[in-house]
Swiss-Prot record:
Family: Belongs to the UPF0301 (AlgH) family.
GO cellular component: cytosol
Highest rank taxon of the organism: Bacteria
Protein name stated in the entry: UPF0301 protein Rfer_1377
NCBIfam families given in the database record: PRK00228.1-1
UniProt xrefs under HAMAP family: UPF0301 (MF_00758)
Stored InterPro entries: AlgH-like (IPR003774)
Species in which this protein is naturally found: Albidiferax ferrireducens (strain ATCC BAA-621 / DSM 15236 / T118)
């Protein structure tokens, strides 16, 4: 692994699938990278809805859904790993303003850049009663790469990378997220060649 790894850390970035990436889950996907280190990477696909919405998910976990604004929001297929497990990407919620590294939820990854990913049920319980984070993306499963794997895929032109924008995650309609992520790079879909290669 190169010594300048810190310069290429993709935590809090989007991975945007190139047209040549033909995979059922990752084709035309946008992945939010929650963690990237020398050991590998972990992320959530933010533009592939499952066949259930938040209201149905909350019924399955036997919680009321008091947030009308979230009832019809889709649950996403976050990736192929642990697809039976829920991952909640949300704005940071701190227990103590003096300790911004500590979340109010039991099992939370604090992501540099202002978001958190929580896997404990307490975040769903908070949402169910109208408390908790206002902006959330709930996914089943996650995407993972082993040591050097993501870097290899990027060098093979499978992915474009760009600093993440929370508006694309939480405010952009699902069908427009891929194109909006490309626009962060000043690109449009027609500009991308399906044939990978280096000039």
């Amino acid at each position: 692994m190169p010594a300048d790894f810190a310069l290429t850390n993709l935590t809090n970035h989007f991975l945007i699938a190139m047209p040549g990436l033909q995979d059922e889950i990752f084709s035309r996907s946008v992945v939010y990278v929650c963690e990237h280190s020398q050991r590998g990477a972990l992320g959530l696909v933010i533009n592939k809805p499952c066949d259930i919405d938040m209201k149905r998910l909350f019924e399955k976990v036997e919680l009321p859904m008091c947030r009308a604004d979230l009832s019809n929001t889709p649950v996403f297929l976050g990736g192929p790993v642990q697809t039976e497990r829920g991952f909640v990407l949300h704005e940071a919620t701190f227990a103590d303003a003096d300790k911004p590294a500590e979340s109010v939820y039991a099992s939370t990854m604090v992501i540099p850049g202002g978001l958190e990913m929580t896997t404990s049920k307490d975040v769903l319980e908070a949402i169910s009663i109208g408390a908790g984070p206002r902006k959330v993306l709930v996914s089943l499963g996650y995407a993972a790469w082993g040591e050097g794997q993501l870097e290899s895929e990027i060098s093979e032109n499978s992915w474009l990378t760009v600093a993440a924008n929370n508006s694309v995650i939480f405010d952009t309609p699902v069908a427009q997220r891929y194109e909006q992520a490309l626009l962060l790079l000043g690109l449009e879909l027609w500009m991308l060649s399906p044939d990978a290669g280096h000039a």
